[in-house]
Amino acid sequence: MASEKSYKTVPVTGKNLAMIYHHMGNKTQSLEEAYKQLEKELGETQAPPPSPQSSLDGEPLSEGELEEISEEEEEEGEAPPPIPAKKRQRKNPSKAPAAKAPRNYGTPSYMLHVDLKHDIAGVLEEIRRASLKKPAHTPSIRNRTYPSITKRYLYERDSKKLQQYLDDSKKLLAKYSEGV
């Protein structure tokens, strides 16, 4: 009933080399010699005979019990098919979700206070021309620079803030004129 296993040579892997090195201990032989010696020892070693007490209770199993166990394992090996995922159901399956109405923002921000924005654009164009003469010179008024005013004034809706942008851009133009 018990079949003897024939051992193959140990493949040279990191784990096996570590085992060989550990087996060597403090001996002065090379790894190759230790590998050959270990291979020889493993070749001489045979598989131990099967234990008569193979059950967990410590009692040996009869041949009938072994056959029953093997039949049960074969039956358990067949797995049931996987359960399909459930689809998410809506509360009212007959009704489709209503489309949202687009929001009406009124007049776009770039259309508000157009005359004031044109004045700011004229001043910013003069600043751009002045900045080309001396590109390293970048003055600021109240932490506002030419690029920051350029980015923000088009989208501003408040006329007071736009008036402040116009005043700041005029002051910046004066600083650019002085610096040149």
Swiss-Prot record:
Pfam families linked to this entry: Adeno_L433K_22K
InterPro entries named among the record's database cross-references: Adeno_L4-33K/L4-22K (IPR021304)
UniProt GO BP: viral DNA genome packaging
Ranges annotated as biased composition (Acidic residues): 60-78
Compositional bias of kind Basic and acidic residues: 33-43
Region feature (Disordered): 31-108
Name by which UniProt lists this protein: Putative protein 33K
Organism: Snake adenovirus serotype 1
